Protein backbone atom coordinates (compact mmCIF):
# COMPACT_ATOMS: atom_id res chain seq x y z
CA UNK A 1 0.00 0.00 0.00
CA UNK A 2 1.11 3.56 -0.67
CA UNK A 3 1.66 5.95 2.23
CA UNK A 4 2.10 9.71 2.07
CA UNK A 5 5.67 11.01 2.40
CA UNK A 6 6.50 14.07 4.47
CA UNK A 7 9.39 16.49 4.41
CA UNK A 8 12.27 15.37 6.59
CA UNK A 9 15.08 12.84 6.44
CA UNK A 10 15.83 12.10 2.79
CA UNK A 11 12.68 13.85 1.53
CA UNK A 12 12.03 17.45 0.57
CA UNK A 13 9.39 19.02 -1.64
CA UNK A 14 6.78 16.47 -0.56
CA UNK A 15 3.86 18.83 -1.28
CA UNK A 16 5.26 20.41 -4.46
CA UNK A 17 5.49 19.37 -8.09
CA UNK A 18 9.00 17.99 -7.49
CA UNK A 19 9.90 15.46 -4.80
CA UNK A 20 13.61 15.41 -3.96
CA UNK A 21 15.20 12.34 -2.39
CA UNK A 22 18.70 13.07 -1.11
CA UNK A 23 21.25 10.31 -0.40
CA UNK A 24 18.75 7.51 0.14
CA UNK A 25 20.08 4.23 1.57
CA UNK A 26 20.29 1.17 -0.66
CA UNK A 27 17.28 -0.23 1.20
CA UNK A 28 15.15 2.40 -0.60
CA UNK A 29 15.89 0.76 -3.94
CA UNK A 30 12.72 -0.56 -5.67
CA UNK A 31 10.51 1.79 -3.60
CA UNK A 32 7.62 2.97 -5.76
CA UNK A 33 6.24 6.50 -5.82
CA UNK A 34 3.21 8.22 -7.30
CA UNK A 35 1.87 11.75 -7.19
CA UNK A 36 -1.75 12.71 -6.47
CA UNK A 37 -2.79 16.13 -7.77
CA UNK A 38 -5.92 17.70 -6.31
CA UNK A 39 -7.57 20.62 -8.06
CA UNK A 40 -10.35 22.96 -7.08
CA UNK A 41 -13.92 21.65 -7.27
CA UNK A 42 -15.44 20.31 -9.39
CA UNK A 43 -12.16 18.79 -10.67
CA UNK A 44 -11.42 15.30 -9.39
CA UNK A 45 -8.04 14.28 -8.00
CA UNK A 46 -5.64 12.76 -10.53
CA UNK A 47 -3.08 10.05 -9.74
CA UNK A 48 0.14 9.74 -11.73
CA UNK A 49 1.80 6.64 -13.02
CA UNK A 50 4.12 4.79 -10.67
CA UNK A 51 7.87 5.54 -10.68
CA UNK A 52 10.37 3.06 -9.22
CA UNK A 53 13.46 4.30 -7.39
CA UNK A 54 16.81 2.60 -8.06
CA UNK A 55 19.60 3.16 -5.52
CA UNK A 56 22.99 1.78 -6.53
CA UNK A 57 25.44 0.87 -3.76
CA UNK A 58 28.71 2.77 -3.47
CA UNK A 59 31.75 0.77 -4.56
CA UNK A 60 33.75 -0.82 -1.76
CA UNK A 61 37.46 -0.40 -2.51
CA UNK A 62 40.27 -2.15 -0.65
CA UNK A 63 43.93 -1.54 -1.49
CA UNK A 64 47.01 -3.37 -0.25
CA UNK A 65 50.75 -3.16 -0.93
CA UNK A 66 53.30 -5.94 -1.16
CA UNK A 67 56.26 -6.07 1.18
CA UNK A 68 58.42 -4.21 1.71
CA UNK A 69 56.42 -1.11 2.62
CA UNK A 70 59.58 0.51 4.03
CA UNK A 71 61.75 1.06 0.97
CA UNK A 72 65.43 1.37 0.19
CA UNK A 73 66.74 2.68 -3.14
CA UNK A 74 66.28 0.05 -5.84
CA UNK A 75 63.31 -1.60 -4.13
CA UNK A 76 59.65 -1.29 -5.15
CA UNK A 77 56.26 -2.07 -3.68
CA UNK A 78 53.20 -3.07 -5.73
CA UNK A 79 49.72 -1.81 -4.88
CA UNK A 80 46.71 -3.93 -5.85
CA UNK A 81 43.01 -3.24 -5.38
CA UNK A 82 39.66 -4.98 -5.20
CA UNK A 83 36.38 -3.27 -6.08
CA UNK A 84 32.91 -4.60 -5.28
CA UNK A 85 30.05 -5.15 -5.89
CA UNK A 86 30.21 -3.58 -9.38
CA UNK A 87 33.17 -3.30 -11.79
CA UNK A 88 35.30 -0.16 -11.81
CA UNK A 89 35.45 2.16 -14.82
CA UNK A 90 38.01 4.74 -13.67
CA UNK A 91 40.86 4.62 -11.15
CA UNK A 92 42.47 7.70 -9.55
CA UNK A 93 45.39 7.15 -7.18
CA UNK A 94 45.83 9.68 -4.39
CA UNK A 95 49.05 10.35 -2.44
CA UNK A 96 49.00 12.58 0.63
CA UNK A 97 45.61 13.93 -0.46
CA UNK A 98 46.69 14.84 -4.01
CA UNK A 99 45.44 12.99 -7.11
CA UNK A 100 48.42 11.68 -9.09
CA UNK A 101 48.80 12.18 -12.83
CA UNK A 102 51.43 10.97 -15.29
CA UNK A 103 54.30 11.35 -14.83
CA UNK A 104 54.24 11.09 -11.03
CA UNK A 105 57.47 11.07 -9.00
CA UNK A 106 57.94 7.69 -7.39
CA UNK A 107 55.32 5.84 -9.44
CA UNK A 108 57.06 3.38 -11.77
CA UNK A 109 53.92 2.28 -13.62
CA UNK A 110 50.19 1.67 -13.43
CA UNK A 111 48.51 5.06 -13.00
CA UNK A 112 44.97 4.85 -14.38
CA UNK A 113 44.68 1.17 -13.47
CA UNK A 114 43.87 -0.77 -10.32
CA UNK A 115 47.53 -1.60 -9.64
CA UNK A 116 50.61 0.62 -9.39
CA UNK A 117 54.29 0.10 -8.62
CA UNK A 118 56.08 2.68 -6.46
CA UNK A 119 59.74 3.17 -5.58
CA UNK A 120 61.63 5.04 -2.86
CA UNK A 121 60.64 8.42 -4.36
CA UNK A 122 56.98 7.53 -3.83
CA UNK A 123 56.79 7.59 -0.04
CA UNK A 124 53.48 8.74 1.44
CA UNK A 125 49.90 7.83 2.24
CA UNK A 126 48.02 6.22 -0.66
CA UNK A 127 44.30 5.92 -1.40
CA UNK A 128 42.38 4.90 -4.52
CA UNK A 129 39.28 6.68 -5.80
CA UNK A 130 37.09 4.56 -8.08
CA UNK A 131 34.05 5.27 -10.23
CA UNK A 132 32.05 2.15 -11.06
CA UNK A 133 29.85 1.21 -14.02
CA UNK A 134 26.87 2.96 -12.40
CA UNK A 135 28.75 6.24 -12.01
CA UNK A 136 29.07 5.82 -8.23
CA UNK A 137 32.33 7.00 -6.64
CA UNK A 138 34.08 6.12 -3.40
CA UNK A 139 37.56 6.17 -1.82
CA UNK A 140 39.55 3.26 -0.41
CA UNK A 141 41.39 2.67 2.83
CA UNK A 142 44.83 4.24 3.32
CA UNK A 143 48.15 2.41 2.94
CA UNK A 144 51.46 4.07 3.82
CA UNK A 145 54.83 3.63 2.09
CA UNK A 146 57.78 4.67 4.27
CA UNK A 147 61.55 4.93 3.97
CA UNK A 148 63.93 2.46 5.58
CA UNK A 149 66.87 4.19 7.24
CA UNK A 150 70.30 2.92 6.20
CA UNK A 151 73.88 4.10 6.58
CA UNK A 152 74.81 2.76 3.15
CA UNK A 153 75.50 4.87 0.09
CA UNK A 154 73.54 3.62 -2.93
CA UNK A 155 75.12 4.09 -6.39
CA UNK A 156 73.41 2.73 -9.49
CA UNK A 157 73.43 1.57 -12.16
CA UNK A 158 76.81 -0.07 -11.62
CA UNK A 159 78.64 -0.61 -13.92
CA UNK A 160 77.59 2.52 -15.76
CA UNK A 161 78.18 4.19 -19.11
CA UNK A 162 78.77 7.47 -17.27
CA UNK A 163 75.35 8.61 -16.00
CA UNK A 164 74.29 7.32 -12.60
CA UNK A 165 72.58 8.36 -9.39
CA UNK A 166 73.72 8.45 -5.79
CA UNK A 167 71.40 8.22 -2.80
CA UNK A 168 72.14 8.54 0.90
CA UNK A 169 69.67 8.66 3.77
CA UNK A 170 68.50 12.00 5.18
CA UNK A 171 65.76 12.65 7.72
CA UNK A 172 62.52 13.76 6.02
CA UNK A 173 62.00 17.53 5.65
CA UNK A 174 65.53 18.24 6.89
CA UNK A 175 66.87 20.37 4.03
CA UNK A 176 70.63 19.92 3.86
CA UNK A 177 73.43 20.93 1.51
CA UNK A 178 75.39 17.90 0.43
CA UNK A 179 78.78 17.66 -1.28
CA UNK A 180 79.57 14.68 -3.50
CA UNK A 181 83.22 14.06 -4.34
CA UNK A 182 84.46 11.39 -6.75
CA UNK A 183 88.01 10.02 -6.79
CA UNK A 184 89.74 7.89 -9.39
CA UNK A 185 91.58 4.63 -8.68
CA UNK A 186 94.78 6.57 -7.85
CA UNK A 187 92.99 8.58 -5.17
CA UNK A 188 92.90 11.82 -7.15
CA UNK A 189 89.78 13.95 -6.86
CA UNK A 190 88.18 14.22 -10.31
CA UNK A 191 84.72 15.69 -9.63
CA UNK A 192 82.92 17.66 -6.93
CA UNK A 193 79.22 18.51 -7.09
CA UNK A 194 76.79 20.15 -4.66
CA UNK A 195 73.19 19.20 -3.97
CA UNK A 196 70.34 20.31 -1.72
CA UNK A 197 68.63 17.35 -0.06
CA UNK A 198 65.13 17.60 1.41
CA UNK A 199 63.74 14.06 1.40
CA UNK A 200 64.99 10.64 2.50
CA UNK A 201 67.16 9.21 -0.26
CA UNK A 202 66.84 12.29 -2.46
CA UNK A 203 68.37 11.58 -5.85
CA UNK A 204 71.75 13.05 -6.74
CA UNK A 205 72.41 12.70 -10.48
CA UNK A 206 75.97 12.42 -11.76
CA UNK A 207 77.19 12.61 -15.35
CA UNK A 208 80.77 11.39 -15.91
CA UNK A 209 80.53 10.65 -19.61
CA UNK A 210 83.30 13.18 -20.23
CA UNK A 211 85.70 11.13 -18.11
CA UNK A 212 87.65 8.07 -19.18
CA UNK A 213 86.67 4.51 -18.41
CA UNK A 214 87.93 3.07 -15.17
CA UNK A 215 87.27 2.57 -11.49
CA UNK A 216 86.15 5.54 -9.41
Task: Place the predicted regions along the sequence by residue.
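Solvent-exposed loop segments of extracellular immunoglobulin-like
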Residues: 1, 83-92
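Solvent-exposed segments in extracellular or luminal domains encompassing
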Residues: 10-30, 106-123
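Conserved structural position at the C-terminal beta-strand
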Residues: 37, 130-132
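Short, exposed coil/turn segments at beta-strand boundaries within extracellular/luminal domains
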Residues: 41-47, 133-139
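Interdomain boundary/hinge segments at the C-termini of tandem beta-sandwich modules
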Residues: 51-57, 143-149
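Proline-enriched interdomain boundary motifs that mark the N-terminal boundary
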Residues: 57-66, 149-155
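A short beta-strand segment in extracellular, disulfide-stabilized domains
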Residues: 74-83, 163-167
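C-terminal outer-membrane/trafficking sorting elements
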Residues: 90-99, 149-156, 161-216
